[in-house]
């Protein structure tokens, strides 16, 4: 049951980036939309296009732990990745706390990583489960 709950949480996180249909958001929600989560979701929306551009260039990829990683030195990539990862961490931690899943934070991160990998465009850099970076 927890794996289903965690998967649905990941769907909500992806929806928060504004790229999933509304019906996906209705399956599961945060118990309380905290100011920190609202700010994190807004930050993710604001940097989405810039992050996508860095991913398209291969400068940033999606790792296997639910975060982005700088793969090639590029002006601004590190600051952008750091901001994105900070916001993701806020969201993951809040969802885990509100749903009594703090012991499963790493699982939430990995499920979200899989969602991000599934959503990645062809040509995007993703890290597989054994740590190798591959092109989708």
Where are the model-predicted features located?
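C-terminal segment of classical bacterial N-terminal signal peptides
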Residues: 15-22
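Short, linear, compositionally biased motifs with a strong N-terminal bias
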Residues: 10-13
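Bacterial N-terminal signal peptides that target proteins for export
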Residues: 1-8
């Amino acid at each position: 049951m927890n794996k289903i709950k965690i998967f649905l949480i990941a769907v909500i996180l992806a929806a928060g980036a504004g790229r999933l249909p509304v019906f996906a958001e209705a399956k599961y929600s945060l118990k309380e939309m905290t100011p920190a989560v609202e700010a994190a979701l807004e930050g993710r929306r604001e940097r989405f296009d810039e992050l996508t551009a860095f991913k398209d260039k291969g400068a940033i990829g999606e790792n296997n732990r639910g975060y982005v990683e700088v793969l090639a030195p590029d002006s601004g990539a590190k600051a952008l990745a750091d901001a994105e990862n900070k916001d993701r961490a806020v969201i993951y931690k809040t969802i885990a706390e509100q749903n009594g899943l703090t012991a499963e934070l790493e699982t939430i991160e990995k499920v979200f990583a899989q969602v991000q990998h599934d959503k990645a465009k062809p040509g995007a850099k993703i890290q597989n489960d054994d740590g190798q970076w591959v092109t989708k």
